[in-house]
């Protein structure tokens, strides 16, 4: 029940219908090429399904995607995630009402996610999360209940794992990456990137990636090219 993938996704494949992004009605138009670039570089050809078409209505929109890729060290990755969450509302334009409850944190694993939540709490930022009491994965029943109520009436920052966010999407994401060495890792990262959606109200979308995996450093540089 805790698996992030359907049977069709086993082996890092993308044959399941949920991952078919050839017509990208939810991805921001100005982000699609970066997603395609990631897929072409890191996903096996026979497993790859890329977003291709940009709907006409998105082409005409004035909204932009505010992208930030932060390459950092394993020692600093958690603190950089925390600082990035705190800075997110400051990046919004005056006409874009971005507030903390809009932010979704997607952590690579429960342990890292719980540490991010704890440090944000120390700074006065409340977070609704799915990491249980300690992030060690042992209190599965509590974690299950947290997942059931994740988006119900939450006026807080939200945090979960990449694996648990399947089926959801958000206009404001922070993604934590520390591992990028296997096909499964790359599939999970692709999943995380494609959880970003365009705002239906014409506001900007926000995606910050905090990465300590050296394998992605060169790709990350293309976000600011």
Residue ranges of model-derived segments:
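Conserved helicase motor core of SF1/SF2 NTP-dependent helicases
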Residues: 1-225
């Amino acid at each position: 029940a805790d698996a992030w993938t359907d049977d069709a996704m086993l082996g890092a494949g993308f044959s399941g219908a949920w991952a078919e992004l050839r017509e990208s009605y939810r991805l921001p138009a100005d982000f699609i090429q970066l997603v395609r670039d990631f897929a072409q570089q890191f996903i096996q050809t026979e497993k790859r399904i890329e977003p291709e078409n940009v709907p006409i209505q998105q082409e005409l929109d004035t909204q932009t995607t505010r992208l930030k890729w932060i390459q950092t060290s394993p020692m600093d990755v958690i603190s950089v995630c925390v600082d990035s969450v705190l800075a997110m509302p400051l990046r919004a334009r005056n006409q874009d009402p971005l507030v903390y409850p809009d932010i979704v944190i997607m952590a690579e694993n429960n342990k890292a996610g719980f540490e991010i939540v704890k440090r944000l709490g120390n700074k006065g930022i409340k977070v609704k999360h799915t990491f249980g009491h300690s992030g060690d994965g042992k209190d599965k029943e509590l974690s299950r209940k947290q997942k059931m109520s994740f988006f119900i009436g939450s006026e807080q920052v939200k945090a979960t794992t990449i694996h648990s966010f399947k089926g959801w999407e958000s206009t404001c994401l922070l993604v934590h990456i520390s591992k990028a060495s296997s096909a499964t890792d790359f599939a999970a990262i692709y999943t995380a990137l494609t959880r970003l959606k365009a705002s239906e109200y014409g506001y900007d979308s926000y995606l910050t990636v905090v990465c300590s995996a050296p394998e992605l450093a060169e790709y990350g540089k293309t976000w600011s090219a």
